[in-house]
Every structure is written in C-alpha cells, then in structure tokens.
Amino acid sequence: MAGSLSEIKAKIISTEKTSKITSAMRMVSSAKLVKSEQAARDFQIYASKIRQITTDLLKSDLTTGSDNPMLVSRPVKKTGYIVITSDKGLVGGYNSKILKSIMDMIQEYHAAGDYEIISIGSIGSDFFKARGMNVAFELRGLADQPSFDQVGRIISQSVGMFVNEIFDELYVCYNHHVNSLTSQVRVQRMLPISDLVAEEAAEEGVTGFELEPNRHVILEQLLPQFTESLIYGAIIDAKTAEHAAGMTAMQTATDNAKHVINDLTIQYNRARQAAITQEITEIVAGANALE
C-alpha cells in the first residue's frame, strides 16, 4: 500500500510540473497572439490601400486589354499551391486541418501529378517530402512575427513560376484567423489576379487617381507588389491563427492536467484512508489476540 501511495504522489507531482509548463506556454502564445493581431491590423491598412489603387487601375486596363502575364488567364495544365503550416507542433489541429484539405484537393484534381507545392513551415515540408510529393521551394524557421524580408524571396519565386508559365494558376492554402478559439481553412486563388479584382472593379466607382506617366505603366509596376502583399497578408493571417491554436492547445492541456491532478488526489486520499483503516484493523486484531 505504501508503494501505491508513493507512486500516486509521484504522479501528482509530475502532473503539477507539466501543468506549470503548459500554463507558461499558454501565456507565451497569448502574448504572441496579441502582437500578431496588431501586426495584422497594421498591415491591413497598407493592403486595403494597395487593393484600392490596383482595382482602380484595372478598371480601365481590363477594358483596353493587357498583355501582363499576371492578368492573363490561360488553360490550366499545372497548378501551384503555397501551403502554410507551422514549424513546430503543440498547436492542436492547426496543421492537420490544412494538410487534409490540400491532400483532398490534390487527390481529386491532380492525380496525374500536375501540381507544384511551395511549402512554408517545417511540418508541411516534412509531410510532403515523406510522401514523395512535388515540392518546388520550401521555407523553414518562420519567425513569430514574420517580416517581408524573411518571406519575400519565396513569394517572388512563387510569382515568378507563374509568370514563367511553370504553372498556370497559384493558390494559397492556410488557416484564416477568426478569433482565439476558431480558425478556418482558406484556399485562395492569387494568380491570375484578373478574377480576384474584377468583381470589385465592376462594383466600385472610379476613385479618380491622376498618375504619371500613365495608368498602364504604373499598373505594370504595381501588380507584382499587389500580389506579393496578398500572399504576405495570408502568411501574417496564418501565423496569427497558429498562435491562437497554440494558446488554445496549451489551455486545454493545462485544464486536462488539473483534472488529472484532482482525480489522482482523490485516488491518493482513498488509498491513504484504506491504509489507515487497515492499520487500525491490524492493531485492534493484535490487541484482541493478547486478551
């Protein structure tokens, strides 16, 4: 019985230590989430403005025609997917949701292998490579608050593959941050961008920008920046969802640890009570034997 009590006590102490670790990790993820949400809000100001300007320029350029490859829809022979996952685990179902979605899409539409994957995040890279899938580029070790300098190269490479007709359309697959408890898998078509902006161009009025030397020349310079901003925004969004998932996972782990501690404490008290009762019974039995 003494051995049983010591074993239960050791489990309680071990679980308490684990609970402290997961609680600390939850607080770290919470702090990262606050920073990411602020970064997303700040970036949205820039993203909204560049979208407005691009939409305005496209209104006239789409009607006059354009040979810019980023605007041209061509027969789809191969598709590119930028897939954003985390570099580490302990984020609940964050990675499994996005990986399941991309696998379902590939199995349904690309049985012949007519796709290329640009992987951001070690979890996704290892997952795809273990299955012998087509990974064109990868980026590991993404910062908690990723700067454009860190991701700019892989974004430019992705856009360049479309422009050079290595693939004919480009999607970004990531977890969209809704709130601290919820994220949604989002598969967003980035290129060609004519469809992406056409609806807004049809609905909104002309903003009346006066640009030099002319709208067409400015648009040629602006389109790559606009597309890169969309992809970068998706990366920030995904990173925010990752921090939220990490915070939720660690909160769940902490709560579960507390439940385990409570159960073990009850088990310990019952075992201790049984041991005391047994000792009293043995003492009484011994006293009766002496009479």
UniProtKB/Swiss-Prot annotation:
| Xref: InterPro entries | ATP_synth_F1_ATPase_gsu, ATP_synth_F1_gsu, ATP_synth_F1_gsu_CS
Q: Which UniProt keywords apply?
A: ATP synthesis, Cell membrane, CF(1), Hydrogen ion transport, Ion transport, Membrane, Transport
A GO molecular function held by the record = ATP binding
Write out the similarity annotation: Belongs to the ATPase gamma chain family.
Localization per Swiss-Prot or TrEMBL = Cell membrane
Organism in which the protein naturally occurs: Streptococcus equi subsp. equi (strain 4047)
Kindly indicate where the leader peptide sits in this chain: none
Give the protein's recorded name: ATP synthase gamma chain
